[in-house]
Amino acid sequence: MPSLLLWTGLGNPEPGMALQRHNIGFMAVDAIAQRHGFTPWRNRFKGLTAEGTLAGRKIILLKPMTYMNASGESVQPATAFFKLPPEAVSAFHDELDLAPGKVRVKRGGGAAGHNGLRSMDRMLGTPEYWRVRLGIGHPGSKERVHGHVLGNFAKSDQEWLGPLLEAVADAAPLLAEGRAEDFMTRIALLTHRQ
């Protein structure tokens, strides 16, 4: 397990987009930074970075300010600067194919239509980084996907969204240790979602 990890939250930088489902990746890294006393966010690598330590490993949190479709243009210079292999990189992102509040971690795989992941794959030259898939649910039909991901979380979503972000922050040290299964289990226990 590398001693330095880059955790990227995927989202869009416009203030008016902050509460959209597509921005749950930003929300997750914000929760981690706040819970674990990371440094204040600062401008770097066409994004915002915050630094801290979890489980004895240095973590760089990154929020690309490039818009979702160009996320790789922020992630690539950060990985090059720190000389990071793909396995040291994780992308926290919204996942249509998981029920709201469910979390799955995997390494590699396809972009599944997610433009942020597609941009990272292209700019990093490999899909072999980690993905922390944060379930937002599927609207039911392909035609409604665009409006769903770019829509704000509904009031009813708050009952699972807040606890989920708290649980991700709470379990983050397990992820830093490379214990993806334990990270997922801890979140499921904390949110009562198996």
UniProtKB/Swiss-Prot annotation:
EC number: 3.1.1.29
Signal peptide per UniProt: none
Positions bearing the site annotation: Stabilizes the basic form of H active site to accept a proton: D94
Coarse class of the protein's main subcellular location: cytoplasm
GO BP term (any one): rescue of stalled ribosome
Reaction catalyzed: an N-acyl-L-alpha-aminoacyl-tRNA + H2O = an N-acyl-L-amino acid + a tRNA + H(+)
Gene Ontology terms for molecular function: peptidyl-tRNA hydrolase activity; tRNA binding
Active site, renumbered: H22
Pfam family, one: Pept_tRNA_hydro
Record's keyword terms, sorted: Cytoplasm, Hydrolase, RNA-binding, tRNA-binding
Entries under CDD domains matching the protein: PTH
Localization per Swiss-Prot or TrEMBL: Cytoplasm
Keyword RNA-binding included in the entry's annotation: yes
Enzyme class: hydrolase
GO cellular component labels: cytoplasm
Site (Discriminates between blocked and unblocked aminoacyl-tRNA): N12
Residues at which tRNA binds: Y67, N69, N115
Similarity section: Belongs to the PTH family.
Record's subunit section: Monomer.
Summary of the function given for this chain in its UniProt record: Hydrolyzes ribosome-free peptidyl-tRNAs (with 1 or more amino acids incorporated), which drop off the ribosome during protein synthesis, or as a result of ribosome stalling. Catalyzes the release of premature peptidyl moieties from peptidyl-tRNA molecules trapped in stalled 50S ribosomal subunits, and thus maintains levels of free tRNAs and 50S ribosomes.
Protein name as annotated: Peptidyl-tRNA hydrolase
Organism ancestry: Bacteria, Pseudomonadati, Pseudomonadota, Alphaproteobacteria, Acetobacterales
